[in-house]
A protein has these predicted regions:
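PRPP-associated nucleotide enzymes
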Residues: 1-174
Length: 174
């Protein structure tokens, strides 16, 4: 649900999973066939996992990090992992790059540049995200929702960002 001022988008688990299914349909209806899904950790892991199951394709993972300060709301320097975790040797062929959103576009641009430079076995690369913000300088190949007001997206699992094991002990009285 988008707030009246357009500054915040609150997403339930059901909405989140429905959006991932719609993303799968966009990729499927394009007719493009790919060999591997490469998700960006952490935001792309949940959509990447679900798409991997729907398309029955191997899932590779590349860690990136740029949100650091104020519970992840302020972007810092972008760190991109040097290696990709994949179940079958080196990532190659046609790759679907998955993240949760194109916010500034900086992460997706930098990752694609890195992949093109460092992973010659990748013959074709397309990107898929759930949300694209208006301020993004990168346009993904596949996106479900365009967000013209650039809201902060409150994903359903965000409560775990500040939860610690001691809080779980209190909650579950174990």
């Amino acid at each position: 649900m988008l707030t009246e001022d357009g500054k915040h988008l609150y997403v339930s688990y059901d909405e989140y999973h429905n959006l991932i299914e719609k993303l799968a349909l966009k990729v499927y209806q394009s007719g493009w066939e790919f060999d591997t899904i490469l998700c960006l950790a952490r935001g792309g892991m949940r959509p990447g996992d679900i798409l991997s199951r729907i398309f029955d394709k191997p899932l590779a993972i590349m860690s990136t990090s740029s949100y650091r300060a104020n519970a992840g709301t302020q972007q810092g320097n972008l760190d991109i992992a040097r290696y990709i975790t994949t179940p079958k040797g080196e990532i190659a062929g046609k790759v679907l790059l998955v993240d949760d959103l194109a916010d500034s576009g900086h992460t997706l641009k930098a990752v694609i540049e890195s992949l093109k430079t460092n992973y010659a076995p990748i013959t074709e690369l397309r990107s898929a995200v759930i949300w694209t913000k208006q301020l993004s300088t990168f346009t993904p190949d596949y996106s479900v929702e365009y967000l013209p007001t650039n809201p902060w997206i409150h994903q359903p699992f965000e409560s775990y960002d500040s939860m610690r094991p001691a809080q779980l002990l209190d909650k579950w009285k174990l």
